[in-house]
Amino acid sequence: MLNIGDSVQIPGCSTKKRLLETTSGCDSFDTLLGGALVNSSIVLIDEYRSRCYGSYLVRSFLAEGLHYGHRCFVADPSEDVSETILKVIPTRKAAEDDQKKEIPSSPGQADNDMKIAWRYGNVKQVTSEIGPSGNQYDFSKHLENSNVDVYNEEIPSFSGLYKILCEVVQKEEAHTKSTGRGGPKKNLLRVVLKNIHLNIWEDYESLGRFLCCLRSLARSSYAVIYIVANSHRMPNDTWRQLESAADTHIQLMPFNEQEKKMFRHLGTAHGYFHLKSLPRLMSAGTHTPPILDLIFEASSKKGFQIRVMHLPPAFDEPAPGQQKATACQNIDF
């Protein structure tokens, strides 16, 4: 939260209720959060039974930061991120591409569209979309040179990672919070920590201490942190530590084979989007989405989209207030 008298202007950020906010790169995700990501917050992404869908949110997060000139930092001890995720960061769509979608292909197309009766004109239409339709990034085209800092150590350790993060935050005081006006120019730091739940860290038993220090570091800096993990492969007590450290907690649970057959009407949806918790950095009350029955779709064509889950009507069941007549009602005495 900004102190009284503070004046910070960072590209890609806005101030709301004395809180600095930034976009995640996914419009539907921002809408669920109340408009944007809150500065100094930690977002926990639980890839339950999967390791492929959370990368869409991470790539949008990094692409948005690179677009506005934010500093980005990625740490993943299990793989070389320079050869994986950094090679598939999407490019931002041009404004001309969105305008082409709105222009009809033929002059008479707009007149030939179907129209509903006038008495239904003011009836609210049911839609599954959350927030603005479409996506700002093209996942089929990738950035050639992504300026992202990478955590690279032969023996990964939480103590070494925290030391590097402190050096990044304090370098030239670009990401440290300061009171009053003046001082060095500030910038936002976007951090992505992947697979910190794996038992390949040298000081894995110090995960709880690392999370406490990380939370304190985030509160005192202009930074937003993404943590990507898998609760399905973690002990319950270890996962509780991650949940306690996170301000925003979401879970991506893909459909199993039976659910894919059951939910064919959902089209290309890939799984459930569970919203576990929202940030409470300013008050005990927080933004509450109007509905929590959500699904997600992740593809290179549409990117990552969150939709409302609409169940098909049950045609076999009688309508409300109507019941089938029983045989006893036709008996004459």
UniProtKB/Swiss-Prot annotation:
Instruction: Give the metabolic or biological pathway.
Output: tRNA modification; 5-methoxycarbonylmethyl-2-thiouridine-tRNA biosynthesis
Q: Which GO terms describe its biological process?
A: regulation of transcription by RNA polymerase II; tRNA wobble uridine modification
Q: Which domain of life is it from?
A: Eukaryota
Q: Name one Pfam family in it.
A: PAXNEB
Cellular component per GO, a single term: transcription elongation factor complex
Molecular-function GO term, any one: phosphorylase kinase regulator activity
- Name its cellular compartments: Cytoplasm; Nucleus
Q: Which family does it belong to?
A: Belongs to the ELP4 family.
Q: How does it assemble?
A: Component of the elongator complex.
Q: Could you tell me what this protein is called? A: Elongator complex protein 4
Q: Which organism is it from?
A: Caenorhabditis briggsae
* Gene that specifies this protein: elpc-4
